[in-house]
Each structure stands twice: as structure tokens, then as C-alpha cells.
Regions:
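Beta/alpha (TIM)-barrel catalytic core signal, keyed to glycine-rich beta->alpha loops juxtaposed to Asp/Glu
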Residues: 1-190
Length: 190
């Protein structure tokens, strides 16, 4: 590809979007950023990305715009606390280590220096296979922040009926991708 762009990254792309992209262009995203947490492990999408050479970046692992309940459900989880106690680590450190051991890129957000130091202190222990499985078992498919199944027809048009969107998306996944590629080509003259 001639031009200024050497790599693109995408956000909240589902497997169907990535498949549609690969069907209409030779562009392979360098990274797909999407929500991953113990309550929503996204194993199938992670595997698809990693199998196709797309780096996975976790976002919104702890955040929630509307309520603190799901966030607290992670931070107060007894299984995560027990694992943390074993290593003398916080629940946040356990979850960050869980992401790291899956080969997932993470950018934990903080403005508070003690939290930054806490986030960095995850390289002096390794979770066992059993502990990784135990954390995976918390999965409920619960989005803490952004649910791509309910908010992604065309460019950011809200869809009221999730089932309606899923049906549309299964039959027209390339529409979203084509719109995106056109926007990229227009913006960067490629």
C-alpha cells in the first residue's frame, strides 16, 4: 500500500467485522481494542485475533460509565481476593496479570501515582494454570461499558433492538467495514 499509513488499529470489531474486512481488502489490522474483563473474557474473539496475527488490546477492564456495581463485582470478588492474598497482590494486580499472561496488551488508566506503581508491580509473580482457569470461570458475557452488539450499524447509529441488529450484522457485516475503509481512504488520501 502506498501512502502514509503503515498500520491500522480497530476498536470493538467483532469476529464478523474482521472476517468482512479480510474478504474485501488485504488490510489486516495491527490491533483490535475491545472490552475484556473477568466478567467478559471474550475468549473466542481473542483466539480469532491471535490466530490471525492481530494484537489484542484490553480496554474498559474495570470501568463503567453508568454504574459502579459491575466494577465492584470484580474488585470485591472473593475468588480474585483469595488469589491476591496468596501473592500479596490487589485484585487489580491479579486481573492485570491475568491479561498479561494471555498475551493481551493493556493500558490501565490512572492519574494517581500509588495506583500507577501498583499497576506496574505485576511482574514478580505468575498465576498458575488453575488460577487462570478460575478467573476465566467468572465469565458471564457481561459488558461493563460498550456493547458492540447494540451500537454499531453504519457509523455509531444506535440500534434499539439487539436481535434486529445481530440479524442485520450477520447478513451485512461488510457495510460497516466498507464505510470505515472509505472514511480512512478519504481522510488520509490513500
Amino acid at each position: 500500500m502506498d501512502g502514509r499509513i503503515k498500520a491500522i488499529g480497530v476498536s470493538n470489531f467483532l469476529k464478523s467485522h474482521l472476517e468482512a474486512l479480510s474478504n474485501i481488502t488485504d488490510i489486516v489490522p495491527a490491533v483490535n481494542q475491545f472490552e475484556i474483563s473477568p466478567l467478559n473474557t471474550q475468549k473466542e474473539l481473542i483466539k480469532y485475533c491471535q490466530d490471525n496475527g492481530i494484537a489484542v488490546q484490553a480496554m474498559s477492564t474495570f470501568s463503567h460509565f453508568r454504574s459502579t456495581e459491575p466494577r465492584l463485582e470484580i474488585l470485591e470478588n472473593t475468588k480474585l481476593k483469595a488469589i491476591g492474598l496468596k501473592y500479596n497482590k490487589s485484585v487489580v494486580q491479579i486481573v492485570l496479570r491475568w491479561l498479561l499472561q494471555q498475551g493481551i496488551i493493556m493500558i490501565p488508566k490512572t492519574w494517581y501515582i500509588p495506583h500507577l506503581k501498583e499497576n506496574i508491580a505485576i511482574f514478580d509473580f505468575v498465576l498458575t494454570k488453575e488460577e487462570m482457569t478460575e478467573i476465566d470461570s467468572l465469565d458471564r458475557g457481561m459488558f461493563l461499558n460498550y456493547n458492540p452488539y447494540g451500537q454499531q450499524q453504519g457509523f455509531f447509529r444506535m440500534v434499539r433492538n439487539n436481535e434486529e441488529f445481530k440479524k442485520w450484522n450477520e447478513t451485512h457485516p461488510a457495510n460497516f467495514i466498507l464505510d470505515l475503509i472509505d472514511q480512512i481512504r478519504y481522510k488520509f488520501s490513500i
